[in-house]
Amino acid sequence: MKKKTIITILILVLLCVTGGCYFGAKHVWLDGRILPTTVTEVTISGEKLPKIKTLERLDALELLDARKITLNAEQYEQLASALPGCHILWQVPIFGGYHDNIETEVVAASIQQPDITMLRYFPNLEKVDASACTDLAMVTALKAAWPELDVTYRAVLGDTELFQDTTELVFEGEDASELLAVIGYFPQLQKIDASGCGDYAALDQIRKDYPNLTITYNIFLGDQLWPFDTKTLLLKNADGEELQKVLPYFTVLQRVTLTGTVPDQETMYELMHAYPEVVFDWKFTVCGVETASTATELILSDIPMETVDAVEFSLKYFYDLQRVEMCQCGISNEEMDALGKRHPETRFVWSFPFGKGYLRTDETALIPFKYGYPFDNPCTDEQTKLLKYCTDMVVLDLGHMQMKDLSFLQYMPKLKYLILGDTRAADYSPVGYLTELIYLEVFWSDFKESDVLLKLTKLEDLNCAWAKLDRPEALYQMTWLKRLWATSVGIPSSELYKLKEALPNTQVFVHGKHPTDGGWRQAQNYYDMRDLLGMHYMQ
């Protein structure tokens, strides 16, 4: 009996063990519950993550809701690796809090670099609201990492809000440096109206840094507001320090006209050189004469001076001073000439005693007769040597004068009409410098330099009758002449026909008892010359 009982007990124990093993194989103990291994959805909770091996036995599991426990990314990865076919719901630690990984929109009050990586655990995410985040650099990094997401953000500038999709902004703050610091994060911004802001430096920097952005602002100057893109300023009683402070912020300024009281000359000089693209139109005095920086002419004649220092010092205040008249100021010819050479861009005009009057160095037409030099009292080298200063001379009639030195002619590049008839100069070669000559009289003179004539290729009228040409055959080459009077120049009478043959298009006159016979003074160039001299026509 005892043996039979024992066997029965053993059988029962075996059955229990076998049944228990079978049950244990088909069920798991999870979170205080017995769950069949065939379960498809499970929610877990508690302070700790269940053992991974336990969860792995749930081979039919399709959904694991782990949102009631705290997981980190590493733990989630362990779960995902252990349950490859299971959809896991969990609270993702991100943006300083926790968010369901199935959310389509999350709020980011602050963003750290790890947060950007954690976004990969949101398969359904569409939007990130970062409106409360002040770190726009991190917002930009998030956008770059997840371009498919709709990221909203903003910048608060005093009472002004700037959103990511803002295209036009009215900025009324005082400190534009705040705007400068954030504007790069708002690529859709196209236009800024900062008319009420006085932070010119920051606004100007915005303009430079973002050339495709339209920005408007005003600059306060001279009790008036001026748009920064003003081209012309008209200011009365302007302050020099104020000008120096705000002028850098006028971007396309071309002209500043100053009236009333103006800054001192040195301040104006500094401004002129600091802004070479701007014309500063202002008035000042030179030797007691009021003038302007934009003046092209300065008249100082009849003002006694001991030196040219004051005049020369003032030249730097002019933009395009072309002419300065200083007639009878008491300055020597040498000093005036040196002044002009130091400043070739400006024509300096003065006068010197000549005969019964004064001859201006800008004279264009001269006949000594008008200055009291008749034939019986001709001027000499003492007077004519000063003609070298008359560089604008166009007409010069020195016929019958007694000068020997003609070197002054080389300083008359504009000379077109020259009369040296009945003269006895030692050297006529300076005539060769006069390449603009169209009319020349050297009759009854000691002119002998025939080759000089060949340099005068613009010459139209030549009267060399009774001149002492050293090589009269040179005349044969002057085919450009319109008229040639060449009586008794050394060409044999029997060969005069050759001269006419050589110059078929030239009126050649080789006869007569007087150099002007044959109608020499009946030609247009002669009339033009006498008109320029203000003299009557002679026969």
Task: Please state what every model-predicted region is.
Residues V17-G32:
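Membrane-interface motif at the C-terminal end of an N-terminal transmembrane signal
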Residues M1-T18:
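N-terminal Sec-pathway targeting helices
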Residues T37-K51, D59-E74, L83-M118, P123-A137, ...:
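Concave beta-strand-loop units of leucine-rich repeat
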